[in-house]
A protein has these predicted regions:
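Glycan-recognition and catalytic cores of secretory/periplasmic carbohydrate-active enzymes
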Residues: 1-172
Length: 172
């Protein structure tokens, strides 16, 4: 419990980890009901993120800022949903791929500066800012996201992203 926060969904990140785990479980078993639950929670996450109505505890962030962690984790769990949808919901596969493409495109277009550094935090208007949070880069996060971005590039046919992803990881 956190004083002043009476929401049950205190961390969109926690919900994302649930989706990822359940989607991968469903993909490896015969549990369509688990896939359906994961997909409903996934859709709820996308809706909350789109409306900017979500929490990131224990790492609260002002609504005036955007965290790289959001498109990063969404790219990852969307791949998990995609893999499960191959088994249970082939009509959803293209939607999942488009979502992955959007999250990776967002990261490469907005969080990577002209020098190839991937910033952890930018403004809500997709601008870099010269303060501690705005200058923060996390090489481990950058490397982890490279894995997700390379998966997306392969699945969505964006081979041209590979060079940018490699440069980002070299510079960060």
């Amino acid at each position: 419990y956190m004083e002043g926060c009476d929401r049950l969904d205190m961390s969109v990140y926690a919900d994302c980890f649930v989706v990822g785990g359940l989607a991968m479980y469903a993909a490896q078993t015969e549990t369509p009901d688990v896939y359906e639950f994961a997909k409903r929670l996934y859709d709820s996450i996308l809706d909350r993120v789109k409306r900017n109505d979500y929490q990131t505890l224990p790492y609260p962030l002002s609504k005036k800022l955007r965290a790289h962690g959001i498109p990063m984790i969404l790219s990852n769990i969307t791949k998990d949903i995609y893999q499960a949808s191959l088994k249970y919901d082939s009509d959803y596969c293209n939607t999942a791929l488009k979502n992955m493409e959007g999250f990776t495109g967002d990261t490469l277009s907005h969080f990577v500066d002209p020098d190839g550094c991937l910033h952890e935090v930018i403004t809500a208007e997709n601008q870099f800012f010269d303060q501690v949070l705005g200058n923060h880069i996390n090489p481990g996060h950058t490397l982890e996201d490279a894995w997700f971005m390379l998966d997306t590039a392969e699945l969505t046919g964006h081979a041209e992203w590979n060079e940018t992803i490699v440069i980002v990881n070299h510079e960060s």
